[in-house]
Amino acid sequence: MKNDSLKGQHRINEQIRAKEVRIVGDDVESAVYPIAQALKMAEDHEADLVEISPNAVPPVCRIIDYSKFLYQLKKRQKEQKAKQVKVNVKEIRFGPQTDDHDYNFKLKHAIGFLQDGDKVKAYVFFKGRSILFKEQGEVLLLRFANDLEEYAKVEQMPLLEGKRMTISLAPKKAGSPKKAETDTAKKENPKKAVETKE
């Protein structure tokens, strides 16, 4: 794994300018040492003296192989990035008098977006006097939300902003198929579902 992007961000060994440093870590006693002694300790450990907190007084260092240090840092950054879930918002535009063919086409796209984990913002755009059909636009968006009930939850009900009426939908967290099948069985035949469970 390449760590080139992280190199040069830390002073190591003779690059450290402080006269004394605080060393932390598992294999050494945490204390303040003169820089010459700290460098000797790093050499004895066949490792590097890495400055990890340059603004502290005195600067904080670790005795560790610099390549290993960069690897750990890169790994930690990658884990943090993985935790940050990026949510995309897909927009779907309707006219106030959208026909069924166009509606179903856009509904299919919305289902795909939601299944991919994206949010959907659907809106009706009113041109000129078509603003007179705003109630029709609201009905259309509510129908859209109702048809997507299996895949999405409503984050924002239809809201008119200028010439656009918008509704916001977020994907539902999918439950396990096994649980869904069990729930269906209970609804269809409660007694049989109980017997199966036993």
Curated annotation (Swiss-Prot):
Query: What Pfam families does this protein's entry cite?
Result: IF3_C (PF00707), IF3_N (PF05198)
Tell me the name of the encoding gene: infC
Tell me which positions the record assigns to the signal sequence: none
Basic and acidic residues compositional bias: what residue ranges?
178-198
**Which GO molecular function annotations are given, in alphabetical order?**
ribosome binding; translation initiation factor activity
Sorted alphabetically, the Gene Ontology BP terms of this entry are: ribosome disassembly
Instruction: Report the GO terms under cellular component.
Output: cytosol; membrane
**Self-association and partners:** Monomer.
* TM region positions: none
In UniProt terms, what function does this protein have? Answer: IF-3 binds to the 30S ribosomal subunit and shifts the equilibrium between 70S ribosomes and their 50S and 30S subunits in favor of the free subunits, thus enhancing the availability of 30S subunits on which protein synthesis initiation begins.
Which cellular compartments is it found in? Answer: Cytoplasm
By sequence similarity, the record places it as follows: Belongs to the IF-3 family.
Q: Which InterPro entries match?
A: T_IF-3_C_sf, T_IF-3_N_sf, Translation_initiation_fac3_CS, Translation_initiation_fac_3, Translation_initiation_fac_3_C, Translation_initiation_fac_3_N
Organism encoding this protein = Phocaeicola vulgatus (strain ATCC 8482 / DSM 1447 / JCM 5826 / CCUG 4940 / NBRC 14291 / NCTC 11154) (Bacteroides vulgatus)
Entry protein name: Translation initiation factor IF-3
Q: Report keywords, A-Z.
A: Cytoplasm, Initiation factor, Protein biosynthesis
Q: Where is this region: Disordered?
A: 168-198
